[in-house]
Amino acid sequence: MVQAWYMDDSAEDQRKPHRLQQDVPVSLEQLKALGVDSLSLDADRYESDPELAKIRKENNYTWMDIITIHKDTMPNYEEKLKIFYEEHLHLDDEIRYILEGSGYFDVRDQKDKWIRIFMQKGDMITLPAGIYHRFTLDENNYVKAMRLFVGDPVWTPFNRPADNCEAREKYVQFLAQTA
C-alpha cells in the first residue's frame, strides 16, 4: 500500500525520502480528499489478473503500455528524469501501476504544500486531471510501471503555472467542494 508524508523543503537529492524532521504522515483518506486514489494489486500476475481487468473495464482504460525507467534502458534518461520532476498537471487523469521497483509521486495539498507518495511493486495510483504533481525515482533508480489511459494516450504536461487551464479550474472547484 502506498505511504505518504509531508515533504521538507530541502534541495538535497530528489530521490531521498524528504520527510520533515518531525514526520507528518498523510493518510489514504487525506489523499482521497485531494482526489488521489490508490490500491494494491498483485503485480506478479498483472498479465492475467482478473482484478486489473475489472478495473480497466470499469474505468474504460482501453490503452496501456509499460515504461521502464532506468539509466540502462531509457534513452535520454537524465533529461527524462528532469521532465518528470518538473511540477506540472495533465488534462486527463494519470494512472500508474508499479510492476517492479519504486518511486515517488509528489502532489500539492489544498495549502500548496508538497506531499510525497511512495509507491512500490503492486501499488496503483490515480492522480486527478488538474492536480499539480511531479515524479521521481527513489534511491534504487529503477521502476517498471504500467501506464493506463482512457482512449489514446496523451502525455502533454502543462508546467506550473497553468491555473487558467480548464482541468485545473475544475480541480480547484473539486477541492472547494471537499473542504
Curated annotation (Swiss-Prot):
It comes from the Eukaryota. Keywords: Amino-acid biosynthesis, Cell membrane, Cytoplasm, Dioxygenase, Iron, Membrane, Metal-binding, Methionine biosynthesis, Nickel, Nucleus, Oxidoreductase. InterPro entries: ARD, ARD_euk, RmlC-like_jellyroll, RmlC_Cupin_sf. Pathway: Amino-acid biosynthesis; L-methionine biosynthesis via salvage pathway; L-methionine from S-methyl-5-thio-alpha-D-ribose 1-phosphate: step 5/6. It is an enzyme of class 1 (oxidoreductase). GO terms for cellular component: cytoplasm; nucleus; plasma membrane. Binds either 1 Fe or Ni cation per monomer. Iron-binding promotes an acireductone dioxygenase reaction producing 2-keto-4-methylthiobutyrate, while nickel-binding promotes an acireductone dioxygenase reaction producing 3-(methylsulfanyl)propanoate. Its cofactor is Fe(2+); Ni(2+). Catalyzes 2 different reactions between oxygen and the acireductone 1,2-dihydroxy-3-keto-5-methylthiopentene (DHK-MTPene) depending upon the metal bound in the active site. Fe-containing acireductone dioxygenase (Fe-ARD) produces formate and 2-keto-4-methylthiobutyrate (KMTB), the alpha-ketoacid precursor of methionine in the methionine recycle pathway. Ni-containing acireductone dioxygenase (Ni-ARD) produces methylthiopropionate, carbon monoxide and formate, and does not lie on the methionine recycle pathway. This is Acireductone dioxygenase. It comes from Xenopus laevis.
